[in-house]
């Protein structure tokens, strides 16, 4: 009986050592690859919309895209930043490596209210996700370049981008913001220092 208890304690001890060693290895890999990255980027550099970003990220700001011929807005954009991004940006005016920005794009509905004509988010169209990459980790992936990973996701599939080339599919909208690292920082009050 004593031998069985000693064997059981020995097996438990070895199991704990193996588990700690495995955790250390996983922790080292996560540190090397950046745990922020794993929430949004796979090993091949493919992006996806991060889980629970509405509750774990910080609201950066929102935009209303004016309707072409009528009052109100045709789209509303709501932008979130991964934890720590705002504080890091406010310290030195740069987005930190691994920062994730998620832009929700909604079709807007417009109607009269007691305060006047009002637009509100109606139907999700999709997401635009950007990941700061100051080290050029995915140079062979056409969705990465100019310091960022870039991808658009339709509302029905937050795991698979419809973007194929950031220069053709994404960057043209950001050209006016080239001088501020491709981001329209003036529209985001939390970034003001």
Predicted regions located by residue number:
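Generic detector of well-ordered alpha-helical segments enriched in charged/polar residues
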Residues: 38, 54, 58, 77, ...
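Bacterial N-terminal signal peptides
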Residues: 8-19
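Signal peptide processing junction and immediate N-terminal pro/mature segment
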Residues: 18-28
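N-terminal post-signal-peptidase region of extra-cytosolic proteins
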Residues: 72-91, 112-115
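N-terminal module-boundary/linker segments of secreted carbohydrate-active enzymes
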Residues: 36-50
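Sequence context surrounding c-type heme c attachment/ligation sites in exported
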Residues: 26-33, 41, 53-62, 66, ...
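Short clusters of hydrophobic/aromatic residues that line enzyme substrate/ligand-binding pockets
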Residues: 47, 79, 184
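Positively charged n-region of N-terminal signal peptides that target proteins for export
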Residues: 1-5
């Amino acid at each position: 009986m004593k031998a069985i208890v000693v064997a059981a304690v020995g097996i438990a001890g070895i199991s704990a050592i193996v588990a700690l060693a495995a955790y250390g290895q996983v922790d080292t890999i996560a540190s090397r690859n950046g745990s922020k990255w794993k929430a949004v980027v796979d090993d091949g550099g493919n992006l996806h919309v991060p889980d629970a970003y509405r509750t774990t990220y910080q609201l950066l700001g929102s935009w209303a895209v004016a309707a072409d011929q009528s009052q109100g807005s045709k789209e509303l954009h709501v932008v979130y930043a991964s934890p720590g991004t705002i504080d890091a940006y406010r310290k030195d005016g740069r987005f930190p490596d691994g920062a994730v920005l998620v832009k929700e794009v909604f079709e807007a509905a417009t109607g009269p209210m007691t305060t006047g004509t009002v637009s509100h988010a109606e139907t999700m169209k999709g997401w635009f996700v950007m990941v700061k990459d100051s080290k050029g980790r995915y140079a062979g992936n056409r969705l990465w370049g100019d310091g960022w990973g870039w991808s658009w996701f339709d509302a029905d599939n937050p795991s698979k981008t419809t973007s194929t080339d950031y220069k053709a599919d994404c960057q043209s909208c950001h050209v006016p913001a080239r001088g501020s690292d491709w981001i329209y920082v003036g529209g985001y009050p939390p970034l003001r220092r």
